Structure formats: structure tokens, C-alpha cells
Amino acid sequence: MLSLVQKIIGSRNERFIKKVSRIVQKINSLEPEFEKLSDEQLKAKTFEYRERLANGEILDNLLPEAFATVREAGKRTKNMRHYDVQLIGGIVLHQGKVAEMKTGEGKTLVATLPAYLNALTGDGVHVITVNDYLAKRDAELMSDIYEFLGMSVGVIVADLNPQQRKEAYACDITYGTNNEFGFDYLRDNMAYEKEQQVQRSRNYVIIDEVDSILIDEARTPLIISGASDDSSEMYNLFNRLVPYLEKQEKEEVENEQEQRDFYVDEKSKNAYLTEKGYAKIENMLKKEGILEEDDNLYSPHNITKMHYLNACLRAHSLYQLNIDYIVRDQEIVIIDESTGRAMPGRRWSDGLHQAIEAKEGVKINAENQTMASITFQNFFKLYNKIAGMTGTADTEAFELHSIYGLEVIIIPTNKPMIRKDHHDEIYGSVREKFDAIVEDIKERISKGQPVLVGTASIEASEVLSTLLKKKKIRHNVLNAKQHEKEASIIAMAGYPDNVTIATNMAGRGTDIILGGNLEVEIAQLEDPTPEDIAQIKAEWLKRNEAVKKAGGLCIIGSERHDSRRIDNQLRGRAARQGDPGESKFYLSMDDNLLRIFASQSMAERVKKGLKGGESLAFGFMSKVISKAQGKVESYHFDIRKNLLEYDNVVNTQRKVIYEQRQSLLEAEDVSDILADIRIDVAEQLFHDYVSAGSMHELWDLEGLEKALKSDFMIELDLQKLYEEDDSLGEEDLKRLVREAIEIEFVEKTKNLDSGAVRQFEKFSLLQSLDTHWREHLSSIDHLRNSINLRGYAQKDPKNEYKKEAFELFSTMLDNFKYEVISSLAKIRIATEEETQRAQQEWQESMSDIKAEHESVIDNNQRHDEDEQEEAPKVQQVRREGPKVKRNDPCPCGSGKKYKQCHGKVE
């Protein structure tokens, strides 16, 4: 019934395309008029549009003229004319949607249309790409168009200094990577002077490869951190012990004889010790002198040992060299599971990276303390408008809409797509599969057809390369080890009978042109004459025609990825802009996807039915594979959704802190802010000793006097005052405390230079807020690591997390206020020069901070209900009894006051 309705009225996507086609017609009708304009007249359009905006006109009304202006500028500066489908893509992006445009349809050129239009407001436009190379390339390619129209263009890459970054952000249009934009946001919220901040408003963002950034990288928070204690000895110890543990093939075993020391869950990338394993590792630790004879790993004081053990167990059983990571320059470099790219600078969390460093015998870097963090999900929500482009978003349309509110629109291709997609072939073993791939390659190159083979890992690419060498088939390999050669390898991938092996092609960002890349060939010539260029073009045309006759580029997939989208990205490298092309996937029942997610009974039936070298290739298996991929996609979506729900709790708190911090940073005088804080602190302190509405016999005036003296250097004999005038009530005493604190501050500062005082107060507030926020992030992280244990007490971990995170936050704010007033009361107010020196020393102490795009491929499972969690490393705010006041005995039993024990903020 639904298909019948769609045939009559068209799908939502078709109706949308039809609607915006009317705007395209209007843009096209303006083309003859704009062609007649002189360069100066065309350039003047930018000023005209800005004037009209200032007079109240809206961007939507300017769109047809602005797009016609950009199209004409493209023709004059780049000899490139925006096709109608590119205009549709530009409209989709301007409207804050995701444009799905196939490979080779010119997404880079499309971005110029909405970027120019939205930059007219003067609030800036950010264009996000997946790496520095593409950011530089796209900015350079399109800068002629922008600059012709009077728009400035900036690029944000990793090696820029703060001043260069500030200048780039001040441009009308700024290109850069998602990591750099996110880190600059975090660094700006750690600055101590307004002038140190580099970003301005987050107005409008266009994200290239939007599915890669908003989905694949949604689980990887950006983290700025500083080094904590060195624990390399413990990692080395457990790295030495773990190989003695034996792996159990499945979680449940039928008898004790089958029980081993640990088992793994490959879906969640976790490893678990059995009771036998616990006993074995405890005995080893006792022999090493790490555990006492009567001690055990379950003791609370051994929590950190469990942390090291779990990390090393996972490092040895689940993470493999050349598949999950490589060793480069004596460092562990993670390989992106989606793209096959090396990701220098990114580190796994929860000690996993240190465990792998110990495993591979490289230097173990200290674990880091988080100072600031944000996920891409919450960072991009800071923008007023988000838009995105990609070749493959339709399969993720539900997630993009449910999490980001982004609608996916499929843009028609400029020329019909004629790629031939063959049925998958399934073999019984990996070796048989690779042999079949080699035979297929031989057959295709014999007729001059270029072949691109996509592999899921470096190991697979090297195995295939070895087999091809044995057959004397020349080929290029592109993986995380050869990333420097990427551009030159891709430029040659379309040559006749050329064979290229590449780990997943997602995000490569370079088109494979049949016959080779003509522009690259011309660029490689030294001082070419017109005759040289003509000869190169003639040779290229011959090769281009030969490859087309041979069937175009052939894509061979060596296995299916977990995500259909990644498979589609690989396929999309063939048949660009109406060229011919083919694609085919080769699978084996030992491939990870089928081994982990397909049913065991079905796998056994298929293996039994296949004799050596035989394969299956029919529709039934495609359904099985699609179902397996659907399971994985659903699993990962749940993880990302869960991550967002947890991160939203911290995000709300982050917004509060960053808004308060920005107000402090921009304030010339913080004395009013401090006055309000002093009132709050006086109330807080008073009620710690005098409960509201209580009888005077229950008042602890002696304790209040001691607190005033020790924490604020104030001598106030409240008991004597009350004895002299017993009519003094609770409010009167509270007023006396408040006035005493206020008078102390006035007396301390009255003879000092007001400028120096204001500067010192501002610095103290910022420094204290940063310190407390950093410690709060650490507490939140420990809370989150352990919260799933509440499920055993029949409590909802998510609700418990929200409740306790709120209490932690409230306590942190109270402690921040108390500590900053107490500190200012105790110290001598510095001169302006001393304050500047203190600021400089503080900033120098922050110079070793690291900006890391932390990989949480290992970290998602903390929300898995079945996960074996660690207990928290810090005392949690789980208050089921009365609130512990600052001067009460600490509940830990130490005999100290709470404020001097577990309530102390260092």
C-alpha cells in the first residue's frame, strides 16, 4: 500500500527535490543577467547583500541571487560551473539538513554556495573536514571564489599558534578539522584572559563526511588532560603475568574440566576472569609479594590492581598489532576501525593504552587526569545551525534525525549511475576467499581493468599483498603504514590494469579517475609547454577510453564491514559521474561479522555444504549478512545513544561552569560577584553550626568561632555576645557572621591599589573554579565507571547517575565558593606585578596539558548491563541519611572533621 502511495505522490525526498527545483529554476533564470556584469559589479554584490540584510531582509530571500553570484564567480575564477544538482545540494545545506551526494559529484564546490550566503551575516561560517590535508586542500581550491567576492578564508590546522588561530577564526569562512575546532573550544574555556581566546561565535557549520564525524566519532570524546601518577611498574608486572592465563572458549562451560582462567566478549570488547582465573592470579601476585597471604583481589584497597589486571587482560586477548593498532616511532598508534587510518595523538582510556604499551615493549606514558572534555554530539549542538554532506547517510538517517534533528536528503546524480553490483561470494575459509580474490584480480587486469581491493585491516592487506607477489602481480598497498603516499597511490589507482589494496576507503577524500589523475600528472611536469600538456591530455584520453571499455574501476571487498554505510562508501569509489564500474564482495564464514553475529547453526550448515574452493552466491546469504550488519548497527546506535544520555548530564553542568567562567573572564571588576559569594558562604558556614529553626541549646557557637578563626582569620566571640544579650536570635547571629566576613575583606583591601586587588580577585576565582571543575570531572568519571553496580541493588543506574552527579555538582559549587573566600581571607593580596607573575606561573604549570581525541572503542562498554565494573575510586555522594556537615566527624571513622578529611578540597 505504501509503495502504491509513493508511486502516486512520490516519496518525501522526491517531493522535497521537486519543491527546491523551483528555486533552482529561479537561480538559472538569473544566470544571463549575472554573466553580463563586470567583475567589479559582481564583486559589489556582496556589499549590496550585506546592506539588505542590515535593513531586515532574510537570508532565504537572498538565496537565489547569492547562489547565482557564487556560480558566476566559480565560472570566472575556476572555470567551474555549479550543476543544477549542486545548487539543490547547496539549498539543502543552507536549510540545515544533510545532503547525501555520491562520490565525484563535487561536494567541495557545493559547500561554497551556503558558506557564502551564511557568511554575509558577518558571524562566520565553519567548514569541517576529516583531516588537515583536506582542510588545506579545500580552502586553497575554493579561496579564489570567496576572495573574488570579498570574503576572507582561514584554515585551522594542528600546527598553528594561538594568534594564527585567532586570525583564521576572524575570517568570514574558516576550514578545519572537527578535532581542532573542538579543542579550541575547550582551550578557550581554560583561558585566563579574554585576549587568549581564539574562537568567536558558533553560527553555522557545514560538516563534510558528516556521517563519519557525527556517528563514527560520536563515541570518542575530545579530552584535554594533564599527567597523573606514574604506574608503569604495575602495568609491566601484569603484562608479564597475564600470558600465563588460559582462555576459555565461551562464557558457560558444562563441567569443571573445561573451565579456564578467562573468557572474552568480542561484541563488547571485554574480557572477564573466571573464579579459577581469580585464584590463579591471586597466587601469582602473592608469589610476587604484591598481595599478602591472607589478602584477596576483592578487597577495596586492591581496586587499582584490578584496574591494571583488566586493562592488561584486554590488551592481550582483544587488541591485535596491525589490526587495532600499529607501532610507529616507539609509540602505539590506534587504527580507526571505520577508515583504516592511523590516528596519531589519540589514546584509549581506562588504562588500555598503557597496557598495550607494556605489551609491545614501548615507553609507558602516564595515565592522564581530565581537565576538560566534550563529545562531538554536544560540541556541534552549540552551533545555531548544522548542515552536512556525505556520500552515504541514508542508512543512518534515523540516528542523525533522532540525535541531531538533521534530515537526510538524497541528491540526484548529475549523470545516471551505471555501476554493476555483483552478488557476494561466500567461502568456507579465509584462505579460500583470498585465493578467489587473487584469481578474480588476474582475470580483470588481463583485460586492462583497474582494481581497488578494500580490506578491513592492515594484516589482511599484507596477506593479500603477499599472495599477489607470489603470482607476480604488481600492485600498490595503501594502509595506515603508508599514509604518506596516499595521494600519489590514489592518483594512479584508475590506470589500466592497476591494482590497489587499501584498508577501508572511508574518508579518503580523493576521487579515483579512470585513466589516472590528469591534473596530478600535469602538476608533476617542470615548466610544461602547451605541447607537453596537449600530449599528456591525449595520452590520458586514450587510457580513459581503454578503462571504460574494460568495464571501469572494479571494487573488490575482502569482507563486509560491521556497517552497511562503510561498505557503500567503498562501492561508491567506482562509477563516478556516469562512468562504468563494478563491485563485488568476497566473504568467508570465519570473517568477524559472520563469526560473531551470524547464528552458529547457520554457519555450521554453510561450512558443511561447501567443499574446498566452492562458494555460495545467492540472495539468501545477502539477507543473512544484512541482518548481521543490522544487529551491529543497532548495537552501536544503542551505545552512542546511551553515551549521549550520560554525557548530557555533564553537558548541562559544563554549560553552567563555562557560562560562569566566561562572565568572570569578561568582567572588569568581580567585587560584586565576590560579595554575593561571601553572603552565600556566610549562610553556609552559619547553618553548618546553627541549624535553621533549632533551639539555642543546640547551637554550636564554639565550633562556629573556631571555623571563623581557622578558615577566615576572623576573631568573633559569639558566645560572649549571646551571653551579654540573650535576645539575639538566629538571624541576628547570622548577620554578625556575614558582617564580620565582609569587614575583614574591606579592611584587608582598603589601603591597596584597587586595580591590583581586582586583578588578583579575578585570577583567584578563575584558578579556583578550574581546580574544582577538574576534580569534579575526575569524580564524575569514577562515578560513571561504577554506577552500573547499582543494577544489582534493583536501582536504575541512569537515574542514580543523574541524581548523584547533581549532588556532586552542588557540593562542588559549595566547596568552590567556600574555598575561594577562605583562600582570599588567608593570603596577602598581591601587587599587580605579583599577580601577573602568579598567572604566568600557573599557565606555565598548564603547559604540559595534552589535547587528545580519546578512543572509547574500549570505553563504550561501561554502560553494558553485563559488564563487570570497578568500584569507585573516590567517595560518592550517596546520601540516604542526613547531610554530613563540614564540621561533623567524618563518616569514614578517622576521627577527623569531615572538612579536614573526605570533605577537604585540595
From Swiss-Prot:
Location of region: Disordered: 853-906
Primary site of residence: membrane
Q: Where is the composition biased (Basic and acidic residues)?
A: 853-865, 877-888
The keyword Cell membrane belongs to this UniProt entry's keyword annotation: yes
What are the recorded GO MF terms, alphabetically?
A: ATP binding; metal ion binding; protein-exporting ATPase activity
* Key words of the record: ATP-binding, Cell inner membrane, Cell membrane, Cytoplasm, Membrane, Metal-binding, Nucleotide-binding, Protein transport, Translocase, Translocation, Transport, Zinc
Membrane topology of this protein = Peripheral membrane protein
Q: Which GO terms describe its biological process?
A: intracellular protein transmembrane transport; protein import; protein targeting; protein transport by the Sec complex
Q: Its Enzyme Commission number? A: 7.4.2.8
What does the record note about the cofactor? May bind 1 zinc ion per subunit.
- UniProt catalytic activity: ATP + H2O + cellular proteinSide 1 = ADP + phosphate + cellular proteinSide 2
**Stored InterPro entries:** Helicase_ATP-bd, Helicase_C-like, P-loop_NTPase, SEC_C_motif, SecA, SecA_CS, SecA_DEAD, SecA_motor_DEAD
Q: How does it assemble?
A: Monomer and homodimer. Part of the essential Sec protein translocation apparatus which comprises SecA, SecYEG and auxiliary proteins SecDF-YajC and YidC.
Q: What does this protein do?
A: Part of the Sec protein translocase complex. Interacts with the SecYEG preprotein conducting channel. Has a central role in coupling the hydrolysis of ATP to the transfer of proteins into and across the cell membrane, serving both as a receptor for the preprotein-SecB complex and as an ATP-driven molecular motor driving the stepwise translocation of polypeptide chains across the membrane.
Q: By its UniProt entry, which NCBIfam families does this protein fall under?
A: PRK12904.1, secA
Protein name, please?
Protein translocase subunit SecA
Origin species, per record, is: Francisella tularensis subsp. holarctica (strain OSU18)
Q: Which gene encodes it?
A: secA
